[in-house]
Amino acid sequence: MIPNIIHQIWIQGYESIPSELRKYHENCLKINYGFKNEFWDNDRIRNFLKNNFEPEYLELYDKYKIYAQKADFARYAILKIHGGIYLDMDMVCRKNLGDFLGLGFFFTAYKLKNVFTNYLNGVIGSRPNHPVFDYIFKNMFLRQNDASNVTNSTGTKLFRDSITEYTKNNPTNDISLIDSKYLHPCNLYNDKNCPYTCTDCYIAHTNYSSWAPHLKLCKIFFENKYLIFIIIIIIFIILILLWIKYKFNKS
């Protein structure tokens, strides 16, 4: 059983949460009545690691320089000890997550136009002391020298590799991959209103991407893809006309 606790992290502290994300956070508290909310910042995380893990865990946490890596490491540690449901701060909550508390461990998959699939670590539910975390921490320590690569060292690739390794070694397990229509219905290429119009969703990711500016650019591209396509066509036509003019003048 997963405890009815929702964990959220903002390394810089509560007062530093952007106003847009704070609205999402407050809405999630209202939607998920009956849940205990736990907010974690850097100071609380460091004290937690110091009191619940061997010294090398805090050392590795401090070694990470990117906030996203610290948040990744912290969510795994928090869920290992306390259990509960972890949510990224840029999640819009639509339905109470109590329906998932009967599971042992759950997550969902991220898909990009059937070209790219990865396991999303922005929403994770777990009972305390789930053995999959042994694999996750083992791999984070093994990859600590690849700290410049967020996805591989702590993020979605690390998460996927660890779950794949665990399930391969433990065919009988309580790992649940939840259909993305319930936990991640909106991708970068979806309409920006998707988090508010999805019908089956319990939560929806807004793809705020605070740690990855290139993802924000991708989001802007997909939101304006038709306008950008028209601009590209116009530029292409202008280049063709200039080339024709050049050829004509040369002859």
UniProtKB/Swiss-Prot annotation:
Gene3D superfamilies: 3.90.550.20. GO terms for molecular function: mannosyltransferase activity. Keywords: Glycoprotein, Glycosyltransferase, Membrane, Transferase, Transmembrane, Transmembrane helix. GO terms for cellular component: membrane. It is an enzyme of class 2 (transferase). Its EC number is 2.4.-.-. GO terms for biological process: mannosyl-inositol phosphorylceramide biosynthetic process. This is Uncharacterized glycosyltransferase L373.
